[in-house]
């Protein structure tokens, strides 16, 4: 989904936000898929460029488990038009994946939805303190879980997590390391 670029309102500086038509389109598409699936939301992921304002809320929450690198505040829009709330209400989106901030590759759970960054993959830009790598996502059809990690150019797997298990604070110390049973 297109998260646009810069604010079109002269008195609101910074980055753009999803417009209401986009939020409504998502709501109608989600409802249609849920209805076709017998009233049960289909597990889904969302991909867009600019992070939602909730990325900063989640990253600042001391009770949240943040996995990965956060070297800068999310450059999110100043206005919030409710896309995250729409996803939460619909119950289909398990995680959102964004880019935009070259010095972030973290993932953090916020109200049951994983908010994650990809990894800087472009060329030489204004700033890039992380090396070019990639976020990999492995989903299973019709199951509300996925595994994600950063894969380095050298083939190393970094920050491998399983949604939602890796982000449960209540018993995370009792769980085996990722990849072990």
Task: Describe each PLM feature range.
Residues 11-105, 175-176:
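His/acidic metal-ligating clusters that form di-metal
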């Amino acid at each position: 989904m297109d998260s646009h670029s810069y604010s079109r309102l002269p008195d609101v500086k910074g980055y753009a936000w999803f417009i209401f038509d986009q939020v409504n389109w998502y709501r109608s598409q989600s409802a249609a898929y849920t209805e076709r699936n017998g009233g049960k939301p289909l597990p889904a992921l969302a991909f867009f460029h600019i992070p939602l304002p909730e990325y900063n809320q989640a990253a600042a929450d001391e009770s949240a488990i943040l996995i990965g690198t956060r070297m800068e505040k999310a450059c999110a829009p100043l206005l919030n038009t409710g896309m995250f709330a729409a996803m939460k209400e619909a119950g289909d989106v398990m995680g959102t994946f964004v880019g935009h901030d070259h010095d972030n590759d973290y993932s953090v759970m916020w109200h049951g939805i994983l908010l994650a960054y990809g990894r800087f993959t472009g060329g030489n830009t204004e700033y890039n303190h992380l090396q070019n790598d990639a976020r990999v996502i492995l989903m299973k059809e019709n199951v509300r879980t996925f595994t994600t990690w950063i894969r380095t150019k050298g083939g190393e797997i970094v920050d491998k997590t399983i949604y939602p298990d890796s982000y449960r604070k209540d018993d995370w110390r009792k769980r085996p390391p990722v990849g072990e049973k």
